């Protein structure tokens, strides 16, 4: 496979709007009760289905800069007011650790993923490696979708896992991405760092609205 950037193709073709469309999808098409419960981590193992990498096609941005700039403060304040278990500042510290990443932008198309770290870009074609269901002490569950880079010459993460509160084929509106080079099993133990990505077309204000209302 020739090494060419996914992003120009996505941007020129306007395909990155597919990610924005996924964002809009959650507004335009009401979720079923099962989808709502799955998003909350409540689902039966038998309802989890395989998914293709195309569910995450598009251009995505890390939300870490928005947290660092203070733009996500309304979200932290809302969480503190609603849950009462942490102050807004404690939530901010929790999410600072969770969102931490050096991958500021991701492009996905035709099973190829580009990882942008500033001016540095690494890419690889990824193969599906199944899904895993994690069970938490709270009684909630998480479905992670596993993919692997088989190109030994690539500097992209060898193992990745998507988690987006969806358990069956559906376009993602945002996602958490676990990345590493050790093994899928090692990533499954990663619970406190979950780099989070929203469509590149969304502003900080858009992301705040999405987090508060969806």
What are these regions (language model features)?
Residues 1-7:
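Bacterial N-terminal signal peptides that target proteins for export
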Residues 7-8, 40:
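Short, functionally important structural connectors and interaction interfaces within domains
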Residues 8-15:
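Bacterial N-terminal signal peptides
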Residues 19-87, 167-214:
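Amphipathic/hydrophobic helical signal segments and adjacent flexible N-terminal regions
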């Amino acid at each position: 496979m020739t090494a060419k950037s996914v992003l120009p193709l996505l941007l020129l073709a306007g395909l990155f709007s597919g990610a924005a469309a996924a964002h809009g999808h959650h507004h335009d098409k009401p979720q079923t009760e099962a989808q709502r419960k799955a998003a909350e981590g409540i689902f039966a193992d038998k309802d989890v289905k395989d998914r293709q990498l195309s569910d995450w096609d598009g251009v995505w941005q890390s939300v870490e800069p928005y947290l660092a700039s203070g733009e996500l403060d309304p979200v932290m304040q809302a969480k503190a007011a609603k849950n009462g278990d942490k102050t807004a500042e404690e939530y901010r510290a929790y999410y600072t650790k969770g969102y931490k990443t050096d991958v500021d932008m991701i492009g996905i198309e035709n099973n190829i993923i580009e990882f942008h770290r500033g001016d540095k870009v690494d890419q690889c074609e990824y193969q599906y490696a199944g899904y895993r269901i994690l069970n938490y002490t709270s009684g909630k569950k998480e479905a992670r979708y596993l993919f692997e880079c088989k190109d030994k010459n690539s500097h992209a993460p060898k193992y990745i896992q998507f988690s987006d509160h969806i358990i069956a084929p559906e376009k993602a509106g945002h996602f958490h991405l676990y990345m590493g080079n050790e093994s899928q099993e090692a990533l499954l133990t990663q619970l406190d760092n979950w780099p989070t990505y929203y469509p590149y077309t969304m502003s900080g204000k858009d992301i705040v609205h999405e987090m508060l209302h969806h």
